[in-house]
From Swiss-Prot:
As a component of IFT complex A (IFT-A), a complex required for retrograde ciliary transport and entry into cilia of G protein-coupled receptors (GPCRs), it is involved in ciliogenesis. Involved in retrograde ciliary transport along microtubules from the ciliary tip to the base. Keywords: Cell projection, Cilium biogenesis/degradation, Cytoplasm, Cytoskeleton. This is Intraflagellar transport protein 43 homolog. One of its GO terms (biological process) is intraciliary retrograde transport. Residues 1-104 are annotated as: Disordered. It comes from Xenopus laevis (African clawed frog).
């Protein structure tokens, strides 16, 4: 009993004689619990659990260590650069003024048209002159007779129209007045058809 009342020490083991393998197993478990309690009160903490990675941690051990080494090297490089940059605080980048920047105005630039060789189209005057000069060629290859065509062709002054500049307001009033007259004529014709015709007796 004296051993149990001692406040500074752990209770001592009973020295009773036990027999059999069960007795030995009980003694071993008591020793293990005593060792664990001593380790917890000492400087050493509990053993660190092994970290097991998930699906993303598929890399092997040596590659992890090399990755850590490269990360450390990169960190040291970044730290050195940041220290150097803090020393060079005098060099502040200057943003240029809008007036200094010359913008190219694309509206003023005109693309050159493509150069394509096109056969020259003959004008009415050229055709008229050719027909007058070459009256013998009115029939081509003996199969095509152009006499009928030359009789029906109109002279150039009759066919040519003058270039008239269109005015939107004038054009709109002309078209609207034409449409109104057409609608009025159509209404008159419908009314005439709907009127009962007098019976002839």
């Amino acid at each position: 009993m004296e051993d149990v009342l001692d406040l500074g020490e752990a209770p001592s083991r009973r020295t009773g004689v036990k027999m059999g393998r069960r007795a030995r197993a009980a003694q071993e478990t008591q020793q293990e619990t005593a060792d664990v309690s001593r380790n917890q009160t000492g400087r050493e903490g509990p053993p660190k659990p092994l970290r097991q990675g998930g699906w993303a941690d598929d890399s092997s051990g040596p590659s992890k260590s090399t990755r850590r080494m490269t990360d450390d090297v990169e960190d040291s490089r970044l730290k050195q650069q940041s220290l150097d940059e803090s020393d060079e605080g005098e060099d502040i980048p200057v943003i240029p003024d809008l007036e200094d920047v010359q913008e190219e105005d694309l509206a003023l630039q005109v693309a050159s048209p493509p150069s394509v060789q096109v056969n020259r189209v003959m004008t009415y005057r050229d055709l008229d002159n050719d027909l007058m000069r070459h009256a013998a060629f009115q029939s081509l290859d003996g199969d095509v007779d152009l006499k009928l065509l030359t009789k029906v062709l109109s002279p150039e002054p009759e066919v040519r129209e003058e270039n008239v500049r269109w005015d939107w307001d004038l054009l709109f009033t002309e078209v609207s007045s034409e449409l109104i007259t057409e609608w009025d004529v159509g209404k008159m014709e419908k009314e005439d058809m709907l009127k009962p015709s007098p019976l002839v007796s």
